[in-house]
Design a protein with these regions (language model features):
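Short conserved AdoMet
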Residues: 80, 138, 152
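A short His-aromatic
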Residues: 132, 136
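A short, conserved alpha-helix within the catalytic core of class I
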Residues: 137-147
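P-loop/Walker A phosphate-binding loop and immediately adjacent motor/lid segment at beta-alpha junctions
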Residues: 146-154
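Conserved beta-strand signature within the Rossmann-like core of class I S-adenosyl-L-methionine
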Residues: 154-160
Length: 160
């Protein structure tokens, strides 16, 4: 079994080989069950951004909005009017933030490539959303710790 520290629960026990495809080997943590790759398979920041630059997600795309409704609707149903939110990993065409703004919420966005403003982490929010982001992070534990610190007590973190 390969030795690797789980990037989510930080377990340093042996991980189980989960899957191999034509590009990389995947491991699974014995404790939290996270499936991850070892650092040797990480993309450089330039490679990662180049891939994201090919995404065609837009707030005007009804199919993309329908896809995001799986996260938007359950969160929206639990919010008080005029709640404040953060869309973490908003991408080149922020859409979740637009959807929440359309129904009266105040939104901040963060994306390390397209909206890299770390001052958004100086605030506390009623809700935080992150869609198609966490699975791309090299250190998801650090991201979750940061997001939890930015949430007001008892508030919502929506991950898709």
């Amino acid at each position: 079994m390969p030795a690797a520290v789980c990037p989510l629960c930080l377990n340093n026990h042996h991980s189980v080989h989960f899957l191999q495809d034509d590009r990389r080997d995947y491991l699974q943590c014995q404790d939290c069950q996270l499936i991850f790759v070892s650092p040797e398979y990480f993309l450089s920041a330039e490679e990662e951004k180049a891939r994201y630059d090919t995404h065609q997600n837009s707030p005007q795309d009804p199919r993309y909005r329908q896809f995001l409704n799986r996260l938007f609707l359950p969160i929206q149903q639990q919010l008080s009017p005029n709640s404040s939110g953060l869309d973490f990993g908003s991408g080149p065409g922020p859409t979740l933030s637009v959807m929440f703004e359309e129904v009266g919420h105040q939104m901040a966005i963060y994306d390390r490539f397209y909206a890299d403003d770390p001052t958004v982490f100086d605030y506390r929010y009623d809700f935080i959303t992150t869609s198609e982001t966490i699975e791309h992070l090299q250190q998801p534990r650090q991201a979750f710790d940061l997001l939890w610190r930015c949430l007001k007590p008892g508030c919502l973190l929506g991950v898709m």
